[in-house]
Amino acid sequence: MNIPDNLRYTKDHEWLQLLDDGVTAVVGITDFAQSELGDIVFVETKPVGTKVAAHGAFGTVEAVKTVADLFAPVAGEIVEVNGALDDAAIVNSDPYNEGWIVKMKLDNAAEVESLLSPADYSALIGE
């Protein structure tokens, strides 16, 4: 299972990458999540400008066999939705790069420290 060292993770299998500006983060689902979901056919998110609470739902991922909610790792505002998600299969093929889901402006960047480290996430999924 691919668990990049430069990201933080949630128990709900989302990942977050804090960008160099220190207030913007990229969010997506993990390789483990996409493999458990199976073939992803549709991703829907709340619109740009939506404020989301930490652990609040910001969208859904629809796969052939199920629909799963997406939860914000930390509180913030959605500032961009990945336009490449029109082809939702990109989340299966490249969940950490081209398959990112939203960019958020964080309310409190210090919240990132409360997320799981790569080692902790690896232990969570039994890797």
UniProtKB/Swiss-Prot annotation:
Q: Which residues carry this modification: N6-lipoyllysine?
A: 65
Q: Encoded by which gene?
A: gcvH
Q: Which domain of life is it from?
A: Bacteria
Assembly notes: The glycine cleavage system is composed of four proteins: P, T, L and H.
| GO biological process per UniProt | glycine decarboxylation via glycine cleavage system
Origin organism lineage: Bacteria, Pseudomonadati, Chlorobiota, Chlorobiia, Chlorobiales
Cofactor: binding details:
Binds 1 lipoyl cofactor covalently.
Alphabetized HAMAP family for the sequence:
GcvH
Question: Where in the numbering of this chain does the Lipoyl-binding domain appear?
Answer: 24-105
Which NCBIfam families is this protein grouped with?
A: gcvH (TIGR00527), PRK01202.1 (NF002270)
Signal sequence range: none
Q: Which family does it belong to?
A: Belongs to the GcvH family.
Q: Which cofactor does it need?
A: (R)-lipoate
| Role summary | The glycine cleavage system catalyzes the degradation of glycine. The H protein shuttles the methylamine group of glycine from the P protein to the T protein.
Name listed for the protein in its UniProt record: Glycine cleavage system H protein
Looking up InterPro entries in the UniProt record yields:
2-oxoA_DH_lipoyl-BS, Biotin_lipoyl, GCV_H, GCV_H/Fam206, GCV_H_sub, Single_hybrid_motif
CDD domains assigned to the protein according to its UniProt record, in alphabetical order: GCS_H
The record's annotation in Gene3D superfamilies points to: 2.40.50.100
Q: Which GO terms describe its cellular component?
A: cytoplasm; glycine cleavage complex
Pfam families per record: GCV_H
Keywords per UniProt: Lipoyl
